[in-house]
Amino acid sequence: MRLCVVSFKECWTDSTGHWYSSGGFPLQIKALASLFDQTTVMITRIKESDGGIELPENAKVVVLPSPQGEGMERKLNVLTHAPIYLSKMWREIRESQVVYIPLPGDLPLLGMGVAVGLRKHLIVRYGGSWEVNDQATLATRFMRWAMRVLAGGRNLMLATGIGDTPPSPNMHWLFTTALTREELETVMPNFERGLSAVPQLVFIGRLSPEKGLPFLFEALKALIEEGFHPVPHLTLIGEGPQRNALETLARIMGLSDYVEFTGQLDRRELSTRLLTMDVAVQPSLTEGLSKAWLDAMAHGLPVIASDVGMARKIIGRDGERGWLVRPGDVSNLKFKLREVLSSPLPWSQVRKRCRQFVEGFTLEAWGDQIARLCTEQWGWAYSNGRLQWMKS
């Protein structure tokens, strides 16, 4: 049985021709591909980059033209090249039994339309915040509407999160993760450590506007201006379109000595870095269920996170596995940083609770949940780690 994945994810090849990508995408595609006999992955291509993770070795990779520009310019570019996109997608989707669409995204949305038109079994996962907030665009509102309308039958619709009540009728919650069972068995945090002499803060993720990093810079600067000592050191792990602007902002704000940009790291490098950190800070303006929260907790790091998406369910009570702050509120973030970094806290207990919480959030469990939902909704068989297609 063949799976086709339609994504706008940027990927690259090394000198040997192996395909790589960043973040949790290649790991999740590996987990998903393991459920099928064959997999086709449709992606966009960039120049060779650092810190990548290999796509499934036996996957067929089909390169889509990279949309040019941003905002409306990008939308017009996609519309102009729609015949090329649709032609390529139609050829690959026609030969597949199941199509996986990671939303939000313009190219995946086109792929979803082709899959519906060809009456294919469809798995759609919305990776952003399912709640409607002031960060929602007309495009993301349309995508959520389309998922609600199409949910059921051949269309397995998944929203990123956890909960007992479905996100919408005929839809399901699905957590997200980049953690493997092997990684959890390998990573052994020092649960007994408190704060470092110079507190080590870390942000993990894409350096993009929705992550709210300028607010974190402002909170850090406010701590310095108030004479807080010792001044914490902030490490930003990740790449993204805002990196140059953030480096400039840090310099203008006089934070260059306190902020480090590592760029994209592979999983091993990420783990090595996280084991030296004290607290993760994720000041996102919008989020579904962040893989960064789980990565941090796997390394015994409590998380200071904006109260968005599933943060309240993941963080728990104040001080349980971290702390919540109002999104975009510099004063609230500064206050919480001061409180966490200056108050006597049961660090050992907090770190142990973080690690224990994420034990079940593995890619193996993620793939099993998707397989179980497929069998329940489509009446398919699932044995020996593979889905068995039963034509309906």
For the regions a protein language model found, what residue spans apply to each?
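Conserved acidic donor-binding segment of nucleotide-sugar-dependent glycosyltransferases
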Residues: R317-V330, E339-L345
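A conserved mid-protein helix/loop that constitutes part of the nucleotide-sugar donor-binding site
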Residues: P199, F203-I224, P241-E247
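Nucleotide-activated donor-binding/catalytic signature segment of Leloir-type glycosyltransferases, i.e.
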Residues: E247-L265
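Short hydrophobic beta-strand element within catalytic cores of glycosyltransferases
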Residues: P302-A305, I315
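Aromatic "clamp/platform" in nucleotide-sugar-dependent glycosyltransferases that forms part
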Residues: L285
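Short alpha-helical donor nucleotide-sugar binding micro-motif in glycosyltransferases
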Residues: I93, Q264-L265, T272-M277, I370
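Short glycine/serine-rich donor-binding loops of glycosyltransferases
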Residues: S290-W293, A311
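A short, well-ordered alpha-helix in the C-terminal region of glycosyltransferases
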Residues: Y258, E339, P346-G360, R372
